[in-house]
């Protein structure tokens, strides 16, 4: 009871602050700020924890998420695949929306479309790809997709947000990803086996403005030559890369993992018969014993255990509130920056200030 009263007090204070900010003249005229404040108030009501999954196209984001879900449902490739923001909701196994997807379109007046992702998997995957089989530009056609699945061993109301790649070629990909990060509470940052590139560093500095909790994951450890560089050694090297390049050597990262998303997925989804293309060409199907070994070799359980433990703990609740307060502070900082800019313009040329800034003098 005490916890509920305390949370309600915090909720009331955040809503009151949001209402006061919404009355500021600079905010009243901005659709962007009004939408942000609406999102914050909605977050107060629902308190759904959101995790963005970010990385280059080649980092294996969709394969990773498929492994987490346990089914090969999201399209995955080394080129531009995730064309739209995809929200993956954790729902109970008996929920009427389980294994369903709702497609939201950009075209005004066009109704949402609900798809059974098991029975109509090809249609579902078409809506997530940059171009579907008819050559339609999905980026322009689809606004977002909500997917409802059950994550085993996770009872929390969690949403994983699959974002377009950092090296996206579609217009607005990067802006869309930044927007989603600003609305989320933590991020899983996926890197290809080569490690952290300059694009990753630039993006991470932007990301750290909005969030505090990061799971750093180097994928594709199955491609390593064990004689030249064992997975354990590569993971230690990657942890040093994160510490020195992202945190400038000042912070020891808490969550760093090396995985094979591919082996984890093949180990879990019994509908997949082959690990690599050459296995398919040779007609050699995976045995149950091999599937079990692939899952163990993937090191996926280490990441999953840490992630689910974090998502089930109190730290998650604090992160939700921190995120809302950061968003409010960002709006206030922007308003203050605009005020200072106008003040400097006024000081430079007081007589002409109203005319230059579209202000009436009578």
Give the ranges of each region predicted by the language model:
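Globular "head" domains of long coiled-coil molecular machines
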Residues: 12-15, 34-38, 42-318
């Amino acid at each position: 009871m005490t916890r509920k009263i305390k949370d309600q007090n915090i909720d009331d204070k955040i809503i009151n602050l949001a209402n006061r900010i919404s009355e500021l003249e600079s905010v009243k005229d901005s659709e962007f700020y009004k939408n942000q404040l609406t999102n914050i108030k909605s977050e107060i009501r629902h308190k759904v924890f959101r995790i963005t999954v970010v990385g280059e196209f080649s980092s294996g984001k969709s394969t990773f998420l498929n492994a987490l879900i346990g089914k090969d449902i999201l399209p995955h490739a080394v080129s531009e695949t995730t064309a739209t923001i995809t929200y993956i909701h954790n729902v109970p196994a008996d929920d009427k929306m389980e294994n369903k997807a709702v497609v939201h379109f950009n075209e005004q007046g066009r109704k949402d479309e609900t798809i059974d992702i098991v029975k109509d998997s090809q249609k579902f995957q078409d809506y997530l790809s940059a171009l579907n089989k008819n050559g339609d530009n999905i980026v322009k056609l689809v606004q977002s997709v909500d997917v409802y699945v059950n994550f085993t061993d996770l009872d929390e109301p969690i949403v994983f947000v699959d974002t377009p790649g950092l090296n996206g070629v579609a217009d607005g990909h990067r802006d869309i990803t930044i927007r989603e990060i600003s609305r989320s509470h933590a991020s899983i940052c996926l890197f290809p086996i080569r490690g952290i590139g300059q694009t990753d560093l630039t993006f991470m500095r932007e990301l750290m403005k909005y969030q505090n909790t990061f799971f750093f994951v180097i994928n594709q450890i199955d491609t390593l030559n064990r004689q030249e560089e064992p997975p354990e050694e590569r993971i230690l090297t990657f942890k040093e890369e994160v510490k020195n390049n992202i945190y400038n050597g000042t912070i020891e990262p808490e969550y760093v993992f090396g995985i094979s998303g591919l082996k984890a997925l093949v180990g879990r989804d019994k509908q997949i018969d082959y690990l690599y293309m050459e296995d398919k060409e040779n007609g050699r199907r995976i045995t149950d014993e091999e599937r079990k070994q692939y899952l163990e070799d993937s090191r996926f359980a280490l990441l999953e255990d840490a992630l689910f433990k974090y998502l089930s703990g109190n730290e998650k609740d604090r992160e939700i509130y921190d995120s809302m307060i950061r968003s409010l502070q960002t709006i206030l900082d922007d308003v203050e920056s605009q005020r200072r800019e106008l003040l400097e313009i006024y000081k430079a040329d007081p007589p002409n200030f109203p005319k230059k800034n579209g202000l009436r003098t009578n």
